[in-house]
Design a protein with these regions (language model features):
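Hydrophobic, Leu/Ile/Phe/Ala-enriched alpha-helical segments that form helix-helix packing faces
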Residues: 88-99, 173-174, 227-231, 262-266, ...
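Generic alpha-helical propensity signal that fires on short helical segments
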Residues: 106, 171-180, 227, 263-265, ...
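Conserved two-metal-ion catalytic palm core of "right-hand" nucleic acid polymerases
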Residues: 1-188, 193-211
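Short, surface-exposed helix-loop/turn micro-motifs enriched in polar/charged residues
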Residues: 76, 80, 237-238, 272
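Intrinsically disordered, low-complexity segments enriched in polar/charged residues with Gly/Pro
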Residues: 64, 140, 224-225, 266
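Polymerase palm active-site segment centered on the conserved acidic dipeptide of motif C
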Residues: 252-310, 314, 318
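General structural signal for secondary-structure boundaries
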Residues: 2-8, 12-14, 81, 166, ...
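Conserved polymerase palm-domain catalytic core
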Residues: 144-241, 247-259, 304-501
Length: 501
């Protein structure tokens, strides 16, 4: 049986909401899996008076980094200051009942669950958010029902959704603009407290939610479900994947009306449509992109139950052709995962390994897939991993693609291979906190005392210039005696945000 939107929130207690958003939602999944906020969560939860109140009330800057998307365009992600983010998650946890009431009020009229990606419990995980999580037993698929009797489909999305949202729009959505404006000076009401906490994770700015931390997804849903309520009340039949809308209508004129209504609802929260991605398409349309069927129905050449060299070559050639035609690296992603499930001959494995390594240098979006879907199934040797890590690192430093550089160092740490191209100067001359951190971790692992000292000296300079913007590197590299305020308290307690690789 499918669940209603409010049912998902009802299954999450206040404590689990706090833990899920902070301990398992502070660091985005786009990062190499070496980060943890669990130690800090347990420390702060067990000793809530550990930090002076004056330190807890301050706004803080964030660490920014770019991650490549399947369209070969980078997206800007963020890592928040731990105290500011903890306090935001605590606020959301404290007011879980009010949030539950809000979501119930905004979604009660829905005949199906409009929002498809949201905070929820997940099987075998304490995290409360995942872009790709789906449970067919309780999520259902409303699209076939929505299509019946309709002739057109509208696709639209919000222009720079998270970056365009205002923290002040949270009270607007929660209690209405009139009440919010009448009480905007009252710092004691919970919705204004939430506004303030949301500002403090972004250096006191009112404009934009951080991309990456899971709390941002809950904040955005506060606003987006309020917009949903107006659209559902107007009897529009649609679904929403965060900021992507798909609406089913009987005529082209109705499609235009939907866009007018959507534009009007978004405007109330100072949001706008991305006109480049707005489309009105005649029905019927395929349920999935055509390239998926092409890949899944392709007859792979086998010998004695194993896919041959020729079979893998033909399959990857086809996948590359589809990727170039559709300009979407996700197609190679899909093909890699399809092949990983198959039994290949040794020659086929070797070809697959070398081709994927070749493609990962050209398309950085594929790099995070390498450990699970390439190195492991195709038995990459230390020599293979060292070679590709060296190529990735040199290319990345030259092009300032620091995501590729940190993954190259991560591979060297995980698989215990040397990376001679890594120098302290690479990190010091960059503006990337994460590159500085990973270079520090590399020298710490290899025991390069001289380079470690260079990095420590650099960290001390950054501590005086822009601690918040580089806090992860500065905190992890400097000893307790060179830290001050909350950082010294955390270091004394033995807290680290890095797990053993």
């Amino acid at each position: 049986m499918s669940l209603r939107y409010m049912d998902y929130m009802s299954t999450i207690s206040s404590d689990k909401l706090h833990e899920g958003l902070f301990a398992h939602g502070m660091f985005t999944e786009k990062l190499p899996p070496i980060f943890t906020s669990e130690n800090f969560f347990q420390f702060y939860k067990s000793t809530p008076d550990a930090f002076p109140k004056s330190l807890c009330q301050k706004p803080h800057g964030v660490i920014y980094f770019e991650s490549w998307r399947n369209t070969n365009v980078p997206r800007l992600y963020a890592i928040p200051h731990p105290i500011a983010y903890y306090n935001l998650c605590q606020c959301l946890s404290d007011h879980r009942n009010e949030l539950k009431t809000h979501f119930a009020q905004q979604t009660h009229a829905q005949s199906h669950k409009v929002s498809r990606i949201h905070i929820r419990k997940q099987k075998n995980s304490k995290s409360l958010f995942a872009m790709t999580y789906h449970n067919w037993k309780i999520d259902a698929s409303p699209e076939p029902d929505l299509q019946i009797g309709n002739r057109y489909m509208v696709r639209a999305d919000i222009s720079t959704c998270f970056q365009s949202m205002y923290t002040h729009a949270l009270p607007w959505a929660l209690v209405g603009k009139l009440t919010a404006k009448q009480s905007k000076a009252d710092r004691t009401v919970w919705y204004n407290i939430l506004d303030q906490k949301s500002m403090k994770v972004k250096n006191g700015e009112t404009h934009g939610f951080l991309i990456g931390p899971h709390a941002s997804n809950l904040l955005s849903e506060i606003i987006l479900t309020a917009i949903d309520n107006k659209l559902v009340t107007a009897d529009w039949k649609y679904i929403r994947h965060i900021d992507d809308y798909t609406c089913y209508v009987p005529s082209y004129e109705k499609a235009q009306e939907f866009l007018i209504d959507l534009r009007s609802c978004l405007k109330e929260y100072d949001l706008s449509l991305n006109h480049k991605k707005t489309k009105i398409l005649p029905l019927p349309t395929a349920a999935k992109p055509s390239w998926i069927y092409t890949l899944t129905t392709f007859q792979l050449i086998r010998r004695e139950g194993h896919i041959t060299y020729t079979g893998v070559q033909a399959y990857l050639d086809m996948a590359i052709g589809l990727m170039l035609t559709h300009d979407d690296t996700a197609i190679i992603n899909y093909a890699i995962k399809m092949l990983e499930k198959q039994s290949l001959t040794q020659n086929a494995k070797s070809y697959c390994l070398k081709t994927m390594l070749h493609l990962s240098v050209i398309y950085p979006y594929l790099i995070p897939l390498l450990p699970e879907y390439v190195f492991k199934p195709y038995h990459a040797t230390p020599a293979h991993i060292r070679k590709i890590s060296e190529i990735l690192y040199r290319s990345a430093v030259t092009s300032k693609n620091y995501e590729a550089a940190i993954y190259a160092i991560y591979f060297s740490l995980k698989y215990k291979v040397e990376l001679p191209a890594v120098t302290a100067e690479n990190a010091i001359n960059s503006d990337s906190c994460l590159l500085k951190l990973f270079v520090w971790l590399y020298f710490e692992k290899t025991g390069d005392i001289d380079s470690m000292q260079k990095m420590r000296d650099h960290a001390a300079e950054l501590a005086a210039q822009d601690f918040d913007g580089y806090w992860l590197f500065v905190y992890e590299s400097l000893p307790e005696k060179l830290l001050v305020n909350e950082w010294q308290i955390m270091k004394h307690a033995g807290i680290s945000f890095i797990q053993d690789v």
